[in-house]
């Protein structure tokens, strides 16, 4: 592979400083003894990350005067807390990641059961596409919230969104309400995960950051074994609903203390005079209007609508609600395509603040990393969307064993991420490892899955492919995050991570759509071609019923052989698409700058 009273009283938002410009403190901002120094001509030509490093060298014990409010708050906290407090905070961040990983692992195991119970198994792609697009696009406003309001405030907001999503999932009574709850749940999950990543970036030096990011993901190693067992227990002892309901109670209690820690040290810095909060001078109504423009709500809506209307029809086709030749399918795709032009026009001529920071995105390292993220997630979800069902049916596994199969990537990538993080700390570079090790392993793993994907092949070969993909993914995910963070200043880190999140989500959504289209056009035909004549009338119920219906046919029977054959054919085309798209990763990584990570990016007590 994971958020209040700011409206009336905060500094006016300072526009992000484009590369090549000189940052200036807003009028009336208290300055330290050195802030009167005027930058020389060379300073104006420094890169964004170089100017940030110079600011840290000149004012290491002061809050950055011209930074956004959220950045000032986290700098103030970092300047006053002790090393013990940092380590204790990291321990609690690890606990938060553990609970997120556990809940996510359980959800991944019970979601197929829920949709099969609704007799709507193919509709699983609808919920995934919606949540991936909406959650991905909203990452950019979330990054702005973190800079404009503060990390703790944003964290509490999205803990609330996440909890509401869990409650809806626990109480839903059909695929439509499940999809609505799943979207809210995934928005909250993605936002919390992003904010925890930003917490880690805020409290670690750049040289150690690859390791700290990887270490923060190690809970997925633990939950790889516990989540399938927990999910199996929920399904056996209660229902899948309690798999969500229990965490609707647990998660707010576990997550909220982290926000309290950051607020406590922020208030301590205020008492010490390191950070002074300036009133904005706006009324409540003016603040609402200000944030509507600052977050570019209209731009966000246009971009979400464009992607949803372009990709969702492929999911609807997979469950029979819209054929490719139908007017509804064609209209949605055309309107979605046209909305991209509407978004471009809005951004160019009407938006006061652009939804996307194009100055950052035009940097070759940032653009290359974003393309790599989209490519990686597209490739992964081309075969992963129905991988749970495939393993359950073709290899006749129970819920726990299937859960272990689907967790191989999490275990392998998180383990290898720690090794890669230590490698980056030692060598101080990451580009060539991604290009000559991580990407080839991904291509090898996806390519071998083209062959090893049916009942005639031992499951051990599938596990081997998953390990290759896991080690490649563990390298590339950390590498692309390091690439964008190394090219940014501290204030740009949330936005950079949001870019990676946005492109990952959009790539994943396209992968979901491709997987759904392959499943729709391959599985039913392959199934019907192999079913005995007396069972052909059951083809639709077998297709719609998912693995719960398909497993009722005994292994070795003609019907089960036909089902297994259909799964093998469907997975083959998904693996072909996954392998082909990874070729784009070669130029995407090649354009990265070969950054040396042995430099300062943050102020205060760090790891």
Curated annotation (Swiss-Prot):
Keywords: Cell membrane, Glycoprotein, Ion transport, Iron, Iron transport, Membrane, Transmembrane, Transmembrane helix, Transport. Disruption phenotype: Leads to lower ferrichrome (FC) uptake activity, which is reduced to approximately 60% of the wild-type activity. It is found in: Cell membrane. GO terms for cellular component: plasma membrane. The keyword DNA-binding does not apply. One of its GO terms (biological process) is iron ion transport. It comes from the Eukaryota. The chain crosses the membrane at residues 86-106, 129-149, 152-172, 180-200, 210-230, 242-262, 297-317, 326-346, 367-387, 404-424, 432-452, 459-479, 499-519, 573-593. Residues 1-46 are annotated as: Disordered. It is a multi-pass membrane protein. GO terms for molecular function: transmembrane transporter activity. Induction: Highly expressed under low-iron conditions and down-regulated under high-iron conditions. Expression is regulated by hapX under low-iron conditions. It holds the Pfam family MFS_1. The keyword Ubl conjugation does not apply. Major facilitator transporter involved in ferrichrome (FC) uptake. Belongs to the major facilitator superfamily. This is Siderochrome iron transporter 2.
């Amino acid at each position: 592979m994971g958020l209040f009273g700011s409206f009336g009283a905060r500094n006016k938002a300072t526009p992000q400083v484009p590369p090549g410009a000189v940052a200036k403190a807003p009028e009336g901002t208290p300055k330290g003894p050195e802030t009167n120094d005027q930058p020389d001509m060379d300073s104006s030509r420094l890169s964004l990350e170089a100017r940030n490093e110079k600011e840290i060298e000149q004012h290491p014990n002061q809050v950055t005067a011209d930074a956004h409010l959220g950045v000032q708050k986290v700098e103030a906290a970092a300047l006053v807390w002790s090393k013990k407090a940092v380590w204790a905070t990291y321990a609690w961040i690890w606990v938060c990641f553990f609970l997120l990983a556990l809940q996510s692992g359980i959800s991944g195991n019970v979601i197929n059961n829920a949709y099969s119970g609704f007799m709507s198994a193919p509709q699983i792609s609808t919920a995934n596409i919606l949540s991936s697009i909406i959650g991905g696009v909203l990452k950019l406003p979330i990054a702005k919230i973190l800079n404009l309001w503060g990390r703790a405030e944003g964290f509490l907001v999205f803990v609330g969104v996440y909890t509401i999503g869990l409650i809806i999932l626990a109480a839903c009574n059909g695929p439509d309400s499940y999809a609505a709850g799943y979207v809210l749940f995934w928005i909250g999950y993605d936002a919390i995960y992003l904010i925890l990543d930003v917490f880690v970036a805020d409290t670690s030096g750049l040289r150690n950051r690859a390791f700290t990011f990887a270490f923060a993901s190690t809970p997925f190693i633990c939950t790889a074994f516990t989540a399938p067992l927990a999910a199996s227990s929920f399904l056996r002892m209660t229902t899948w609903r309690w798999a969500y309901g229990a965490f609707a109670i647990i998660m707010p209690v576990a997550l909220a203390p982290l926000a309290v820690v950051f607020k406590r040290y922020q208030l301590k810095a205020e008492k010490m005079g390191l950070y002074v909060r300036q009133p904005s001078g706006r009324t409540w109504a003016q603040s609402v209007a200000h944030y509507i423009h600052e977050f570019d709500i209209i731009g966000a809506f246009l971009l979400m609508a464009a992607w949803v209307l372009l990709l969702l029809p492929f999911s609807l086709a997979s469950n029979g609600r819209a054929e490719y030749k139908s007017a509804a399918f064609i209209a949605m795709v055309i309107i979605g395509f046209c909305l991209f032009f509407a978004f471009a026009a809005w951004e160019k001529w009407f938006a006061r603040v652009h939804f996307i920071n194009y100055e950052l995105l035009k940097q070759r390292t940032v653009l290359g990393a974003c393309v790599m993220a989209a490519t990686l997630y597209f490739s992964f979800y081309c075969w992963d969307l129905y991988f749970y069902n495939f393993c359950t049916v073709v290899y006749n596994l129970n819920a726990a064993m299937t859960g272990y199969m689907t967790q191989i990537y999490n275990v392998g990538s998180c383990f290898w991420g720690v090794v890669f993080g230590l490698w980056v700390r030692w060598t101080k570079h990451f580009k060539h490892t991604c290009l000559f090790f991580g990407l080839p392993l991904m291509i090898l793993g996806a390519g071998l899955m083209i062959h090893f994907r049916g009942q005639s092949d031992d499951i051990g070969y599938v596990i081997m492919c998953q390990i290759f993909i896991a080690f490649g993914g563990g390298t590339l995910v950390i590498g692309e995050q390091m690439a964008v963070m190394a090219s940014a200043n501290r204030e740009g880190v949330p936005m950079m991570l949001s870019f990676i999140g946005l492109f990952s989500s959009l790539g994943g959504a396209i992968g979901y759509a491709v997987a759904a289209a392959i499943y729709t056009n391959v599985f039913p035909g392959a199934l019907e071609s192999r079913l005995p004549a007396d069972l052909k009338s059951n083809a639709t119920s077998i297709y719609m019923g998912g693995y719960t219906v398909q497993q009722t046919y005994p292994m070795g029977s003609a019907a089960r052989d036909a089902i297994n054959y259909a799964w093998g054919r469907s997975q083959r085309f998904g693996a072909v698409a996954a392998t082909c798209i990874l070729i784009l990763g070669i130029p995407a990584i090649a354009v990265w700058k070969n950054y040396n990570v042995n430099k300062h990016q943050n102020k205060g007590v760090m790891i």
